[in-house]
C-alpha cells in the first residue's frame, strides 16, 4: 500500500516559508551570522520533511557540510579555473567544484 500524497497547498506553503527564511538569512548575515545559519538549517529541515528539492539558486548559498550560510567574500572563496568553479567554505574548508562552459 502506498503512502497518501500531500495536498498541493502544503507544498506551496512550504516553498513560501523556505523563500522567506532564505531572504531573512541574507538580511541578517552582516549583523547576526549565527541567526542566518539557523535559518538555513530550518530551510533544509522543511525541504527534507516535505520532500521538496531546493531551487538551484539556493543550493550554492549554503555549505552542505556545515550548514552555514555562505556569502562570497566573507566566508566563501570562489575561484574560476579550467572550466570549473571552485567554491570553498572558509568555515569548515569544504571544497565544491562545479563545471561550466564559456558562452561566446
UniProtKB/Swiss-Prot annotation:
It comes from the Archaea. Its EC number is 3.1.26.5. Keywords: Cytoplasm, Endonuclease, Hydrolase, Metal-binding, Nuclease, tRNA processing, Zinc. The keyword Protein biosynthesis does not apply. It catalyses: Endonucleolytic cleavage of RNA, removing 5'-extranucleotides from tRNA precursor. It is found in: Cytoplasm. It is an enzyme of class 3 (hydrolase). GO terms for biological process: tRNA 5'-leader removal. Zn(2+) binds at residues 63, 66, 89, 92. Gene3D superfamilies: 6.20.50.20, Immunoglobulin FC, subunit C. The keyword Nuclease applies. Consists of a catalytic RNA component and at least 4-5 protein subunits. This is Ribonuclease P protein component 4. It comes from Methanosphaera stadtmanae (strain ATCC 43021 / DSM 3091 / JCM 11832 / MCB-3).
